[in-house]
């Protein structure tokens, strides 16, 4: 049986209306066990200022972003279940959901799925990688009972 341990950190000022720990756990459980049996993941919910600082420091982008993924790399020869950290910016997630006319819960779920796949080594730098990652995201989101998060983009193509 797989086990995903969640460390949820609420580092944003307003906690009202945030998904609860059980929801974050369900979303992680919908992704990670497909790829590995045991994992520990920290999800830190932050405000725009912290997201902006981290995005600038680690990605050179001078703005807040929806989700940042920081995979943990154990020293050679040491097996650890620590997968890494997801930093999710509440304001950006809420703004994107509204702009994209997506249910807020579904967008939160998508950010956890997307970030978790990054922790597992997936990326979207080139078109082939993006297609593979988006296909996995869609499959996982549908399996959890949500719509395809890329449906609007597919309709306009």
Curated annotation (Swiss-Prot):
It is found in: Cytoplasm. The keyword Transcription does not apply. Its cofactor is Zn(2+). GO terms for molecular function: metalloendopeptidase activity; RNA endonuclease activity; zinc ion binding. Keywords: Cytoplasm, Endonuclease, Hydrolase, Metal-binding, Nuclease, Ribosome biogenesis, rRNA processing, Zinc. Gene3D superfamilies: Metalloproteases ('zincins'), catalytic domain (3.40.390.30). PANTHER family: ENDORIBONUCLEASE YBEY, CHLOROPLASTIC. This is Endoribonuclease YbeY. The gene is ybeY.
């Amino acid at each position: 049986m797989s086990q995903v341990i969640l460390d949820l950190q609420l580092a944003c000022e307003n906690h009202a209306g945030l998904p609860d720990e059980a929801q974050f756990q369900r979303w992680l459980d919908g992704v990670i066990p497909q790829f590995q049996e045991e994992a520990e993941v920290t999800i830190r919910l932050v405000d725009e200022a912290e997201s902006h600082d981290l995005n600038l420091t680690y990605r050179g982008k001078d703005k807040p972003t929806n989700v940042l993924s920081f995979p943990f790399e154990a020293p050679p020869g040491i097996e650890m279940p620590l997968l890494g950290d997801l930093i999710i910016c509440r304001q950006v997630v809420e703004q994107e959901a509204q702009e994209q006319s997506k249910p807020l819960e579904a967008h939160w779920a998508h950010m956890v799925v997307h970030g978790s796949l990054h922790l597992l080594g997936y990326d979207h730098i080139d078109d082939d990688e993006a297609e593979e990652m988006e296909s996995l995201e869609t499959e996982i989101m549908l399996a959890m009972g949500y719509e395809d998060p890329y449906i609007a983009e597919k309709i306009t193509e």
